[in-house]
Amino acid sequence: MPDPGWAARTPEANDLLLKAGTGVGTHLANQTAWTTLGASHHASGVASAINTAATAASWLGVGSAASALNVTMLNATLHGLAGWVDVKPAVVSTAIAAFETANAAMRPAPECMVNRDEWGVDNAINPSVLWTLTPRIVSLDVEYFGVMWPNNAAVGATYGGVLAALAESLAIPPPVATMGASPAAPAQAAAAVGQAAAEAAAGCGMRSAYQGVQAGSTGAGQSTSAGENFGNQLSTFMQPMQAVMQAAPQALQAPSGLMQAPMSAMQPLQSMVGMFANPGALGMGGAAPGASAASAAGGISAAATEVGAGGGGAALGGGGMPATSFTRPVSAFESGTSGRPVGLRPSGALGADVVRAPTTTVGGTPIGGMPVGHAAGGHRGSHGKSEQAATVRVVDDRR
């Protein structure tokens, strides 16, 4: 639609409006682009036609004929698109020519401004010269309003009309492309678009769910940390009570330590008394029969009786200390009358009673603090222990 403002604007305003743009530079760039695109479409159509003609001889069957038909239709559509593009450079060329014509036909804005300036000066000095400038003022008005204004308005309107027509030519849509070899291509494209939209929605849902789970995990972690902090504070509060409970057994152990100190001090004295009470420790060969009997019987009363029979020596440390005695070890040889059948002992074989010397007890002088032992065989009484001589059995297997 042409601009209706051409007739309403002043001549200088229309001229400035037409020349205020970029001129024909953008028109020329657009014309070159359309020309290049049309040439490309023509070249593609020609190349496709040559390829079809070269390979159609090797196509067989109904499918080959359908393919050749589709290629021909596509090439025709491409050439139709190239023809639609070929019109555009001519349209742009017409617009360039219209702009140049309008630019040349327009009365320049400086000329229009000079007319108006002179008209104003003449009107200012006309009374002083007795209105002798009135004819000049009228001619200036006729030139401005009768020539400049109508001219520029007409040129602008004409140029606007040409551009409106060219715009309608440019608005013609391109030819519709024919269906290709795959009729299901549009449906597949629509399905692909739908699938992409569904995947995008699913991705957004998964991200939202992950963010929710992450937020929940963060809250749970904070709750767990709070519980751990409370447990640490509780254990810190219980530490003084545990220290008090540990100090109580240590305080109870102090009296027992005081009781153990005198006993530890008495241990060297007890060791010394035990040394004097053992005759064998001082090199004495004999031991008191009464003490031996007391050790064998294990009775406290028997030990007291034998100690009284031995001479009543004084004991250090009181009457509760038992006498030390020596017990003869058991013989390693069995007796000859053990009940098992044995052979006759040959003459000349030695028995245990011949080999073993009689055991004697050597009496000694009493030592202070130790009872005196009796001689061997003295005062054995009913507490004596009968001894049986051990024999050695020798079996001669040489016969």
Swiss-Prot record:
Pfam families: PPE
Source taxon at top rank: Bacteria
Region span, Disordered: 375-399
Family statement drawn from the similarity comment of this UniProt entry: Belongs to the mycobacterial PPE family.
Protein name from the UniProt record: Uncharacterized PPE family protein PPE69
Organism taxonomic ancestry: Bacteria, Bacillati, Actinomycetota, Actinomycetes, Mycobacteriales
